[in-house]
UniProtKB/Swiss-Prot annotation:
Coiled coil: none
InterPro entries, alphabetized: SQ_cyclase_C (IPR032696), SQ_cyclase_N (IPR032697), Squalene_cyclase (IPR018333), Terpene_synthase_CS (IPR002365), Terpenoid_cyclase/PrenylTrfase (IPR008930)
Renumbered ranges of PFTB repeats: 149-190, 516-568, 642-683
Source organism of this protein record: Arabidopsis thaliana (Mouse-ear cress)
Name of this protein: Marneral synthase
Function in brief: Converts oxidosqualene to marneral.
UniProt entry tagged with the keyword ATP-binding: no
Catalytic activity: (S)-2,3-epoxysqualene = marneral
EC number: 5.4.99.53
Record keyword Metal-binding present: no
Pfam families: SQHop_cyclase_C, SQHop_cyclase_N
GO cellular component: endoplasmic reticulum; lipid droplet
BP term (GO), one: triterpenoid biosynthetic process
Length: 761
């Protein structure tokens, strides 16, 4: 039976190192003798329920770890479930009861180190690169047991589309990118090309690939993986010359200009490209060469495939001028720099420089790297440099950090969300006004935040190594990943301020005030001239560089951007900080808030909404915008922006009283209701919060009562809420954040309960 181990509970590896006793680390381990017959039957029932209902909801409820924690804590839901017939007759006691049920359940889901575990999945191009890398390096069977393989195959089968392909995420149409990578993944894991049982997964996938032109129509990142495996030729790839890391700082584009994740990704890719590394051919590799193309492998003209991309993948088409630019880069890279004598001087020096950067970034992120997309490239680059070296072994030790097990199988996560989950979950707990009932939850959560703050900048000359300041920030994941984010830092500040106000006798040792100052300093440093807040690093403002992007399936990948949600969170966090510590950099904070407010107001859409970059989509964005505006003193009475936002939310409420937004809103950049305008509890919680923050209860509470009825009646017997469509997103890729169903539903109910209490009093 699979069990989730937290922090130092997990089996240790001599190549792991930690700065905070592995706080937040989440590792799945299989216990062959674990689980009672009842528990094992419960696991199989959960798998069957998911498989039977995946045509309706493709996101798993992520129940395995929750049930494990509830058993370990002997949690029983003793509060009777509330059912509402008439929304207009909801009482304070009804709302408080539903809130307490949900909060006590969710508190029981807290890990012993203070965070709330969760998978962060959905992208269907994350699994195969790890499998390919481990296959090439000969470590597949050392990392993957038979149980791992069984669960990974389960996930592949569960997420395959009816037409045989796989989409960018589990809810989207099939694309060459994910279909060709997952086909290779299945073959490496031992699935036969034609006779693989009733599912015929490989046969169906291969038909899709060949019907759409073959693997030469895969996008850039997929071509790189095909090339290192030896089932594609590097000459058919867009150039990724390692010399980019030698460009001077005054160059319009250099390593420091790049967006942090494309920088991380290109480091490993460019080293492998510069080396033209190809795995030693095996019988399987030779078979794949024949299976992936409609024509003989030896007859493919690779140079003509360089700019090819299947129309299903080409969400952001490239112009003739862009293709011409990349042809020029290819000519410079391969016909000049990579020819004697320059290859002996420039290329070799560039490769050494690239690996110095790879090692630096790996060390400063504890070999977690920026995220799942970059890690296998870094890991393979380290193996190519030295198969027996410690760098590669340190990478292997961190592979389990990316694995997640749920009812739908095993998948590799994009990254963890430990700190983000903790900050938002604690805000929910604090809003519930149940401090005495959940004191231990608050203490553990506060301790986790204190352990998770980054206390120093990256070692050495970090700017030379293309790393910016980090001191004072919180990451999305855990402290050891080392890449702080603005919104997560702001949300953590707000939590810590609330805890700072509590008596030490209740909450324990307080965070050093200087550490809060460090966090605020980090946020002030990040703000752009336009008032917006980027996520990770100061935005360079060179948005014209996006024209150079070689990536076909997503936009805005070259340089850091400003984001609405980050700006709203930062304003809310700094307003809270300013009230408690008015003497720390007051002018800079006031300036940041003023510029941030204008940035938010300028982004408002004609219908009163805001576009959300990190969630689905206009409902999510509108919540973070209104929350930031309201924190700074804007109200329905004095702010046209809030009035328009409230009207947008009222206009999109469905007949049931809830909200449900289609993920199509994100790529189309206009509000689209869910199919049939069906309610989603996450969207409903977010929209209800907008109305409550916007003072709707004082004008006409009926829409809020109707929304509350939806949430209260949606609550399950245990106190959980139903898992519906995925509500996380980045660009056009849906991400699975299962804890959102608890956080936003309970946060809305907490605000609603407080509003009812004020009406009663």
């Amino acid at each position: 039976m699979w069990r989730l181990r937290i922090g130092a509970e997990a089996r240790q590896d001599p190549h792991l190192f930690t700065t905070n006793n592995f706080a937040g680390r989440q590792i799945w381990e299989f216990d062959a003798n674990g689980g009672s017959p009842e528990e094992l039957a419960e696991v199989e029932e959960a798998r069957l329920n998911f498989a039977n209902n995946k045509s309706r909801f493709k996101a798993s409820p992520d129940l395995f770890w929750r049930r494990q924690f509830l058993r370990e804590k002997k949690f029983e839901q003793k509060i009777p479930r509330v059912r509402i017939e008439d929304a207009e007759k909801i009482t304070y006691e009804d709302a408080k009861t539903a809130l307490r049920r949900g909060v006590l359940y969710y508190a029981a889901c807290q890990a012993n180190d203070g965070h709330w575990p969760s998978e962060v999945s959905g992208s269907m191009f994350l699994d195969a690169p790890f499998v390919i890398c481990l296959y090439i390096t000969g470590h597949l069977e050392k990392i993957f047991t038979l149980e791992h393989v069984k669960e990974l195959l389960r996930y592949m089968y569960n997420t395959q589309n009816e037409d045989g392909g796989w989409g960018l995420d589990v809810e989207s149409h099939s694309v060459m990118f994910c279909t060709v990578l997952n086909y290779i993944c299945l073959r490496i894991l031992g699935v036969e090309p034609d006779h693989d049982g009733q599912k015929s997964a490989c046969a169906r996938a291969r038909k899709w690939i060949l019907d759409h032109g073959g693997a030469t129509y895969a996008p850039m990142v997929a071509k790189a993986w095909l090339s290192v495996l030896g089932v594609y030729d590097w000459s058919g790839c867009k150039p990724l010359p390692p010399e980019i890391w030698m460009l001077p700082s005054f160059s319009p584009i250099n390593g420091g200009t790049l967006w942090i994740y494309i920088r991380d990704l290109l480091m490993g890719m460019s080293y492998l490209y510069g080396k033209k590394f190809v795995a030693t051919p095996t019988a399987l590799i030779l078979q794949l060469r024949e299976e992936l193309y409609p024509q003989p492998y030896s007859k493919i003209i690779w140079s003509k495939a360089r700019n090819r991309c299947a129309k299903e993948d080409l969400l952001y088409p490239k112009s003739f001028g862009q293709d011409l630019f990349w042809e020029g880069v290819h000519m410079l890279s391969e016909n000049i720099i990579n020819r004697w004598p320059l290859n002996k001087f420039v290329r070799q020096r560039a490769l050494r420089t690239t690996m110095e950067l790879v090692h630096y970034h790996d060390e400063t992120t504890h070999y977690i790297t920026g995220a799942c997309v970059a890690k296998p490239f870094h890991m393979l680059a380290c193996w190519v440099e030295d198969p027996d070296g410690d760098y590669f072994k340190k990478h292997l030790a961190r592979v389990p950090d990316f694995i997640w097990i749920a009812e739908d199988g095993l998948k590799f996560q994009l990254m963890g969300m430990q700190s983000w989950n903790a900050a938002l979950s604690l805000q929910v707990m604090l809003a519930a006004n149940m401090d005495d009932e959940i004191r231990s939850t608050l203490i553990k959560g506060y301790d986790f935040l204190k352990q998770s703050q980054i206390s120093e900048n990256p070692q050495g000359d970090h700017l030379k190594m293309f790393r910016d300041i980090t001191k004072g920030g919180w990451t999305f994941q855990d402290r050891e990943q080392g890449l702080p984010i603005s919104d997560g830092t702001a949300e953590s500040i707000e939590c810590c301020i609330h805890f700072h106000r509590m008596p030490s006798e209740f909450i324990g040792e307080k965070m050093d005030v200087e550490k809060l100052y460090d966090a605020v300093n980090f946020l002030i440093y990040l703000q752009s001239d336009n008032g917006g807040m980027p996520v990770w690093e100061p935005a360079p403002g060179k948005k014209w560089l996006e024209w150079l992007s070689p990536v076909e399936h997503v936009e805005n990948t070259v340089v850091e951007q400003e984001y609405l949600e980050c700006t709203g969170s930062v304003i809310a966090g700094l307003v809270c900080f300013k009230k408690e510590f008015p003497d720390h950099r007051p002018k800079e904070i006031e300036k940041l808030i003023k510029k941030g407010l204008k940035y938010i107001e300028d982004l408002q859409m004609p219908d009163g909404s805001w576009y959300g970059n990190w969630g689905v989509c206009f409902t999510y964005g509108t919540l973070f915008a209104v929350r930031g505006l309201a924190a700074a003193g804007k109200t329905f009475g004095n702010s046209e922006a809030i009035r328009r936002a409230v009207q947008f939310i009222l206009n999109t409420q469905n007949a049931e009283g809830g909200w449900g937004e289609s993920a199509l809103s994100c790529p189309n950049k206009k509000y689209i209701p869910s199919k049939g305008n069906v309610t989603n509890v996450v969207n409903t919680g977010q929209a209800m919060m907008v109305l409550l923050i916007g003072g709707q209860m004082e004008r006409d509470p009926s829409p809020v009562h109707r929304a509350a009825k939806v949430l209260i009646n949606s609550q399950l017997d245990i106190g959980d809420f139903p898992q519906q469509e995925r509500r996380g997103i980045y660009m056009n890729m849906l991400l699975h954040y299962p804890t959102y169903r608890n956080m936003f539903s309970l946060w809305a109910l907490a605000l609603y309960t407080n509003a009812l209490r004020l009406l009663v009093s």
